[in-house]
Amino acid sequence: MSEPASISTGIAARYATAMFELAEEAKALPALEKDVDALDAALSESADLRDLIHSPIYGRDEASAAIGGVADAMKLQDMTGNTLRLMASKRRLFVLPALLSELRERIADHKGEVTAEVTSAKALTKTQLDKLTKSLKAQVGKTVTVKETVDENIIGGLIVKIGSKMIDTSVRSKLNALQNTMKEVG
C-alpha cells in the first residue's frame, strides 16, 4: 500500500534528523555521506533491493534480516545498518529513497553546499557551467553543485531550481506567457 507523499516525507525527515544528529555527535558525517552514496547507488542498480523496500510480501523479520544482510555486505556504518533494520521492523523501508534525499540535503547544508538543478536545451559547455556556478554561488552565498539535465523541449534558455526557488528563462515558458497574454487580449 502506498503512503501519501507528505507522510513519507515526514517519516523520512524524522529518521534523517536522528541519523544526522547521531553522526554529527560521533563526528561521522563523512562516513554517513559515503553510506548515503552507496545506498543510493545500490537502489539505482538493484531491482531486488527496490523490490525489498516496496514489496509488502516480505514480513518484518524477513525484511529486517535481508536489509541487515545488505548493510553488512555493503560494509555500512553500524548506525546506518541498525537504522535500516529498525525501519524494516517498523515497515518503513518504503521511505528509504526519501530518507537518502533528506540526509543528502542535511549533509550538504552542514557543509555549506547547495545543489542547483539546471535544465537546458543543449548541454552546457565547461565555461558556461563555470560562469553559471559562480553566478549562483554569488546569489545564494554557498558552494553550488550543478546537476545538469538536457531537455530539448524548452527550446532555449535555462530552468534553474535551487531548493524551492525556480528561475525559468526558457523560450518555452516565454512563448507560453505570450500565448496566455494573447488569449487575454483576444
Curated annotation (Swiss-Prot):
Belongs to the ATPase delta chain family. Pfam families: OSCP. It is a peripheral membrane protein. The lineage of its organism: Bacteria, Pseudomonadati, Pseudomonadota, Alphaproteobacteria, Rhodobacterales. SUPFAM superfamilies: N-terminal domain of the delta subunit of the F1F0-ATP synthase. This is ATP synthase subunit delta. Its main location: membrane. Keywords: ATP synthesis, Cell inner membrane, Cell membrane, CF(1), Hydrogen ion transport, Ion transport, Membrane, Transport. GO terms for molecular function: proton-transporting ATP synthase activity, rotational mechanism. It comes from the Bacteria. InterPro entries: ATP_synth_OSCP/delta_N_sf, ATPase_OSCP/d_CS, ATPase_OSCP/dsu. F-type ATPases have 2 components, F(1) - the catalytic core - and F(0) - the membrane proton channel. F(1) has five subunits: alpha(3), beta(3), gamma(1), delta(1), epsilon(1). CF(0) has four main subunits: a(1), b(1), b'(1) and c(10-14). The alpha and beta chains form an alternating ring which encloses part of the gamma chain. F(1) is attached to F(0) by a central stalk formed by the gamma and epsilon chains, while a peripheral stalk is formed by the delta, b and b' chains. The gene is atpH. It is found in: Cell inner membrane. The keyword Disulfide bond does not apply. Disulfide bonds: none annotated. F(1)F(0) ATP synthase produces ATP from ADP in the presence of a proton or sodium gradient. F-type ATPases consist of two structural domains, F(1) containing the extramembraneous catalytic core and F(0) containing the membrane proton channel, linked together by a central stalk and a peripheral stalk. During catalysis, ATP synthesis in the catalytic domain of F(1) is coupled via a rotary mechanism of the central stalk subunits to proton translocation. GO terms for cellular component: plasma membrane; proton-transporting ATP synthase complex.
